[in-house]
Design a protein with these regions (language model features):
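Hydrophobic/aromatic beta-strand patches that form the interior of the parallel beta-sheet core
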Residues: 53, 137-139, 172
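Soluble metallo-hydrolase cores and metallopeptidase-like ectodomains found primarily
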Residues: 76-108, 158-208
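Alpha-helical scaffold elements within enzyme catalytic domains, especially in hydrolases
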Residues: 21, 43-44, 129-132, 185
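A conserved hydrophobic secondary-structure block that centers on an alpha-helix together
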Residues: 102-145, 149
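BRCT (BRCA1 C-terminal) domain core and associated BRCT-interaction motifs
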Residues: 62-64, 69, 139, 145-154, ...
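Alpha-helical metal-binding/catalytic segments enriched in His/Glu/Asp
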Residues: 45-46, 120-121, 208
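Noncatalytic luminal/extracellular "stalk/propeptide" segments of secretory-pathway proteins
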Residues: 2-13, 17-115
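Solvent-exposed loop/turn segments at secondary-structure junctions
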Residues: 29-30, 58-60, 103, 121-124, ...
Length: 208
């Protein structure tokens, strides 16, 4: 049976107090603040009477840091994604090619050495298809706002069998509004796109 004092402590105010405390930390994987949040929760559970153990284990983490995007020399706000490769500081540069939602096949060689501009939310399948079609980078046009997402299909830390599901070319996303401007520019001219990504991807210790 539940301890009567524990039942008394169950309340919306008590819950929101804990949520507010936890949300005050930026809990990036492998960060000191993530560890502090874990210790805070462990202490709460210990005080209730649970036996808990905080362990540190190796994990392959990926945190998007920054991206820049220039289309025809005009800077456009963009965001990169977890598991996107980082570029060199000066970025990559190539002609852009709009391929719609990229569900249909395109003529072989059409994307060779180009940066693909694709409709929809960033995902591994479209990135991998662009890569195998010869693209060196991908710009996704989001349906609305840019969603935080991971562009890998290797769930959890990759193994020798799943590492092939991690993208090999850099990826950024733009808003739908910016995407319409990019499409208009590409339809009128042959345009150079420059994109740079910085993503902190590495093995590190994280709590659990």
């Amino acid at each position: 049976m539940l301890n009567n004092n524990l039942i008394i402590d169950i309340s919306i105010d008590n819950l929101m107090e804990k949520v507010k405390k936890i949300s005050g930390w930026q809990r990036y994987s492998g960060s000191d603040e993530e560890l502090e949040a874990f210790k805070y929760l462990k202490n709460i559970l210990d005080n209730i009477g649970y036996e808990t153990k905080l362990i540190m284990h190796d994990a392959y983490i990926s945190i998007p840091i920054s991206s820049t995007l220039y289309v025809g020399g005009v800077q456009i706000y963009s965001q990169t994604h977890s598991m996107s490769p980082s570029t060199i500081s000066s970025g990559i540069e190539a002609y852009g090619l709009y391929v719609g939602d990229f569900k249909n096949d395109i003529e072989e060689g059409t994307l060779n050495g180009k940066i693909a501009v694709i409709e929809g939310r960033a995902g591994f399948e479209q990135v991998d298809k662009a890569y195998t079609s010869g693209a060196i980078g991908v710009v996704f046009i989001s349906d609305g706002v840019i969603r935080e997402s991971i562009v890998s299909n290797a769930w959890g830390s990759p193994t020798q069998y799943t590492k092939k599901f991690i993208p090999k070319i850099p990826v950024v996303s733009v808003t739908n509004e910016s995407g319409e401007k990019i499409k208009d520019t590409l339809q009128k001219n042959i345009v150079i796109i420059n994109m740079a990504t910085t993503v902190d991807t590495r093995w590190t210790k994280i709590p659990s």
